[in-house]
Amino acid sequence: MKYTLVVMTGPENGMGHDRARGFAQALAQQGHRLQRVFFYGDGVRAAQGETPQCQQFWTTLAESEGSELVLCSASAERYGLTEPVPPFTLMGLGALMEAGFDSDRIISFD
């Protein structure tokens, strides 16, 4: 199955982000395809250098699984993330809509 995850909480703001990371690992271990992780709202902070272990987790996952890491452009702008470090990219909400067509499941974490 092909999955897209929507992460709406920051790395240190509760269990939502931790659950997303655990779910992403479980998908990889079970042979599912994680197509895209869409970071929205406070979730875009996963791409900031102030949480290097979180940033490294998603980067490693993207490289090993071939997943896209997408930051909502409006949310990223609010946090001053105008030039994210690859493999994180900026896209609008249209990328999330597109994921709805390309994925079998979209799971959100907040």
What do these predicted ranges mean?
Residues 3, 34-35, 69:
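Hydrophobic anchor at the start of a short beta-strand
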Residues 3-18, 43-50:
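Short, glycine-rich nucleotide/cofactor-binding loops
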Residues 16-32:
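Histidine-anchored nucleotide/phosphate-binding helix
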Residues 19-22, 51-57, 89-90:
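Charged helix-capping and loop-helix junction motifs
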Residues 35-43:
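A short beta-strand-loop structural module common to alpha/beta enzyme folds
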Residues 52-80:
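A glycine-rich helix N-cap at a beta->alpha junction
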Residues 79-109:
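C-terminal structural segments of small proteins and small subunits
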